Design a protein with these regions (language model features):
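A short alpha-helical cap/connector motif
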Residues: 1-213
Length: 213
């Protein structure tokens, strides 16, 4: 993961980062308009940039796919191995809907794993791969949040990013703080407030952690 490039180029995607209502490049607007989602163009631009910074042997893992908006955005004009994991029990989420949205935007076919991440990953669903990005947007209870990061640790490449959504939520923010206090290999490199703190253009906030070697 080229973390230096990510942190250098992220502000360049916007006229006034993080205050801009949307990125300069509006290619993510059709995704937000077509696909039911819980994100904004800004969130999608961040994920797309992160995916573009992966190392040659690293994979992108998304936990919590819903209708596929963020996965489509991450894959847009990026190559590599992408993995989406979801039990599809949130609202009307379904594997079929995700596949339809992937096909509509022509981004190729990721590996879509249907089931509980806390069962699939320990059972070897990722094989010997190393994740350069672990994007967690699933169970946002305090315990679920911490475990959603811990479960990734054996598969993280040196310098990998752990990206977490909805960090405005009190239990998520607290879980992030406690995880960092307990895990010296993880460092918070970016915090972006969301609508609860005056930045609705970032939905409900994001944080990025970097995993050291």
């Amino acid at each position: 993961m080229d973390s230096e490039r990510f942190l250098r180029e992220l502000p360049e995607l916007f006229e006034n980062f993080p205050h801009s209502e949307h990125p300069v490049d509006r290619r993510f607007a059709p995704i937000v308009e077509r696909v039911e989602n819980l994100a904004r163009e800004n969130n999608l631009a961040l994920l797309n940039l992160a995916a573009s910074c992966l190392g040659p042997d690293e994979i992108y893992v998304e936990v919590g796919v819903f209708h596929g908006a963020s996965l489509v955005a991450a894959m847009l004009e990026n190559e590599g191995r992408f993995v989406g994991i979801d039990s599809f029990d949130f609202r009307d989420g379904s594997l079929e809907t995700v596949e339809q949205n992937l096909a509509h935007f022509g981004v190729g076919q990721p590996e879509l794993l249907m089931g509980d991440v806390f069962e699939l990953v320990p059972a070897g669903a990722l094989g010997q791969a190393r994740a350069g990005v672990w994007y967690y947007d699933a169970l946002h209870t305090y315990e679920g949040q911490i475990e959603g990061l811990r479960i990734a640790e054996p598969w993280l490449a040196p310098g990998a990013f752990l990206i977490v959504d909805d960090t405005d939520w009190e239990q998520v923010a607290r879980a992030m703080d406690d995880y960092l206090a307990d895990q010296p290999r993880a460092t918070r490199v970016l915090t972006i407030d969301g609508k609860d703190r005056g930045f609705p253009q970032w939905w409900e906030g994001m944080q990025v952690l970097e995993w050291s070697a």
